[in-house]
């Protein structure tokens, strides 16, 4: 990067932070700025609640970030961060945390101190083990750890009675804890592309379960008494690309064995009045039902979404519990008219900065 461009970018970042401090903004977007080191000025933004630092070149997270005690949303995904400070557990108000796509390899136990955390994404961080302290996150609603190197799931995770969205696809998981049915709020469970040999029967006993994705595993048979297990909310079990598909197997209206969905299942996948009510109630209760952990949607009318591509469905009518989303779709931001005006004002200053930079060089 030329000295001029670096000068302009660095001063633009500082100008954005200074405006946030002066106006006591609750939202600060510093994503996609090619930041390699978090500016120390940022730690003076004591009013900030939503801090977006994703898609940068950040290599470390200084302990000073824990001075921002009002943080409810923190996005650090798509950086080059190799460790988190133990003091991150001091961010007691944090609700949404995304650390995906960083070479972290471990989750520090202090993650369990984030007592208000509701949405936690740690996709593709080279994770080999989920710490047992995950069980302390009693308010956790959404957890994603896809594309890691996990072989087991700690039994402590099964005490998360408010967890509704669990996606652990593309790992090396060989079995699940036997008491998965303790997760009484679980709606979506995605364990596809793992190494499961036994059908996790206890998951079926989760009373709110709608979608169970087990495709691309090593399952060869359904559990004994499968038809007798009560599944009041279940919409579909995906067993495609398992050995069971190549063997004689019992047909079941809710089980998908092939690429072609049986007509009965298609009908089941169309939300009934009861399932629509379930989805609406879920969305009203918590925006993380949409897996959009940046901002709880009900607090923002007619939001403008930026730096994201989603399927176009509105917040009100989306009940897509079946499909998982990519990490790039998790950092949803909203800008008010005032915030857009501020950004435009900063942009008008850049030509002047460029002139001074030319002189300096």
PLM segments and residue spans:
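The feature captures the LRR N-terminal capping module
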Residues: 1-170, 174-178, 185-188, 201, ...
């Amino acid at each position: 990067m030329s000295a001029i461009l670096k000068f302009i970018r660095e001063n633009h970042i500082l100008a954005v932070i200074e405006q946030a401090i002066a106006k006591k903004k609750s939202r600060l977007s510093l994503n996609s700025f090619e930041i390699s080191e978090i500016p120390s000025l940022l730690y003076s933004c004591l009013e900030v609640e939503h801090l977006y630092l994703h898609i940068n070149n950040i290599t470390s997270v200084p302990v000073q970030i824990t001075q921002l005690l009002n943080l409810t949303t923190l996005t650090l995904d798509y950086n080059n961060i190799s460790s988190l400070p133990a003091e991150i557990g001091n961010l007691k108000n944090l609700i949404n945390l995304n650390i995906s796509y960083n070479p972290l390899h471990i989750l520090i136990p202090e993650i369990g101190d984030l007592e208000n955390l509701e949405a936690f994404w740690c996709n593709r961080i080279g994770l080999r083990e989920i710490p047992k302290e995950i069980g302390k996150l009693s308010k956790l609603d959404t957890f994603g750890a896809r594309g890691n190197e996990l072989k087991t799931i700690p039994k402590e995770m099964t005490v998360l009675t408010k967890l509704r969205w669990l996606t652990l696809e593309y790992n090396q998981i060989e079995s699940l804890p036997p008491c998965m049915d303790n997760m009484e709020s679980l709606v979506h469970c995605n364990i596809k592309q793992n190494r499961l040999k036994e059908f996790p029967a206890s998951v079926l006993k989760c009373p709110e379960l709608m979608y169970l994705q087990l495709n691309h595993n090593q399952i060869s048979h359904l559990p004994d008494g499968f038809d007798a297990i009560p599944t009041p909310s279940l919409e579909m079990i995906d067993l495609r690309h398992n050995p069971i598909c190549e063997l004689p197997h019992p047909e079941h209206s809710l089980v998908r064995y092939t690429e072609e969905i049986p007509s009965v299942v298609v009908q089941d996948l169309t939300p009934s009045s009861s399932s629509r009510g379930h989805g609406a109630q879920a969305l009203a209760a918590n925006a993380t039902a949409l897996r959009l952990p940046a901002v709880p949607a009900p607090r923002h009318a007619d939001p403008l979404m930026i730096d994201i591509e989603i399927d176009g469905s509105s917040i009100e009518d989306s009940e897509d519990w079946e499909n998982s989303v990519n990490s790039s779709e998790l950092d949803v931001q909203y800008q008010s008219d005032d915030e857009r005006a501020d950004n435009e004002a900063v942009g008008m200053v850049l030509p002047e900065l460029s002139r001074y930079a030319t002189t300096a060089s």
